[in-house]
Amino acid sequence: EFASAARAVKKADPKASLTYFSSDPNFLAGLVRQAGGRWYDVTDSTVKVIMTQDAASRKVADFWQKLINEGSIPVHEGYTPQVYKQMNEDTLISELYGIWDTALIAQNVPKGKGKWAVAPLPEWPDRPGGADMGGSATVVLKGSKNAEAAVRFATWMSTDPQAVSILISKGGLWPASTTGLANKALQKPDAFYSNDKVFVPFIDVAKNLKYDWVWGPTQVQAGQDMENNLVKVSKSYPMTKALADTQESTLAKLKKQGIKVG
């Protein structure tokens, strides 16, 4: 259904696209996770990198590659002026990102006020449900002059209901705890989105997420490598090749750090 919609948009207006494939590695990771896949198998003694062997990863890659090859969907870097320009011009009419993207679109696409809405991610028939995309952590660095105060502030910012309300309403951030799903800020209408309660559709999604995804120990570097590869995806450089190249460089970095690979 999603693929048919992408083709219909391109047929109706060759300058427009339903969405784009983002080179952000967290984007692909979220799609793979939703499809039931994984990139790593980690034990106490070894790390297996299985980006190319994973069936769900291949399924997701093949789905998007077909749309890219036929010209229905472009490949872009995320969060760029080019993307927001196309959104303001109504030539890029949706974005498959995390709930925090509601705030970014509202900030960067002023001409889209009243035109945009929020919906759950399209689902695979054999695996209904959603997935996380990205995530964040708050860190106090060693050597901080006010480490104790910084830890107290970070704890308040991440756990106090009033602070979490601010993060939700101003940053579009999703509460990390299940108790946070009762935060009243999630029920607040958003003027940019025609006063829809944009967070509400994701409450049930969050309750039913399967937390079985594992990141590798060198994921920061692996993510950078993957982004450099994904931005090149085209007919001549398919997504499966991007995954293979990322797997190869990831294995090399794991071995260089003395980590046993399977």
What feature does the model see in each segment?
Residues 69, 205-262:
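Conserved C-terminal helix/tail region of periplasmic/extracytoplasmic solute-binding proteins
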Residues 3-16, 84-88, 101-109, 251-255:
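Pocket-flanking alpha-helical
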Residues 1-3, 75-89, 123:
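Short helix-initiation/N-cap motifs at beta->coil->alpha
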Residues 93-98, 117:
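Paired acidic/hydrophobic, glycine-rich loop segments that form the ligand-binding mouth/hinge
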Residues 2-49, 56, 92-94:
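Extracytoplasmic/periplasmic solute-binding protein
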Residues 11-23, 160-170, 252-262:
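Bilobed periplasmic-binding protein-like "clamshell/Venus-flytrap" ligand-binding domains
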Residues 4-8, 46-77, 121:
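Glycine-centered hinge/linker elements that transmit conformational signals in sensory
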Residues 100-112, 124-228, 261:
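C-terminal lobe and pocket-closing loops
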